[in-house]
Design a protein with these regions (language model features):
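Solvent-exposed, conformationally flexible loop/turn segments
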Residues: 13-18, 61-67
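Short, surface-exposed beta-strand/strand-loop-strand elements in extracellular ectodomains
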Residues: 39-59
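Beta-sandwich interaction modules
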Residues: 64-78
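Short solvent-exposed strand-capping/beta-turn motif centered on an Asx-Ser/Thr pair
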Residues: 36-41, 86
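C-terminal interaction-tip segments
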Residues: 1-33, 85-99
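Short, aromatic- and glycine-rich surface loops/edge beta-strands on solvent-exposed regions
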Residues: 79-85
């Protein structure tokens, strides 16, 4: 079974919790990097949940700034990545490895 580097999420945030990615059947994912980019002139808050459990909870990202987090979080078949922010001018970038 090959390990494949993969972009899981490249999406603008919603202001209520929304599913950004679901692990495909017969796959396991390791999330290795999360970036939250605020493109507004004011600070925002953002949250990321792995399988409905808060991983990043209401973190503040400054105006026109990016939060970058390295991690090694395993997600199994059908588990989800969800996210939301206080503004829709926030972008989530989440990548890792799929096998």
């Amino acid at each position: 079974m090959a390990n494949v580097a993969k972009q899981f999420v490249r999406a603008a945030a919603a202001t209520s919790s929304a599913t950004l990615y679901t692990v495909p059947a017969s796959k396991t994912n390791i999330v290795t990097n999360i970036s939250i980019t605020n493109t507004t002139a004011a600070a925002i808050t953002a949250s990321i949940l792995f399988n409905d459990v808060a991983y990043i909870a209401a973190v503040t990202v400054g105006a026109n700034d990016t939060l970058v987090m390295d991690t090694k979080t395993v997600l199994s078949t059908t588990q989800t990545i969800k996210g939301f922010a206080s503004s829709t001018s926030v972008n989530f970038h989440i990548s890792g490895v799929e096998f």
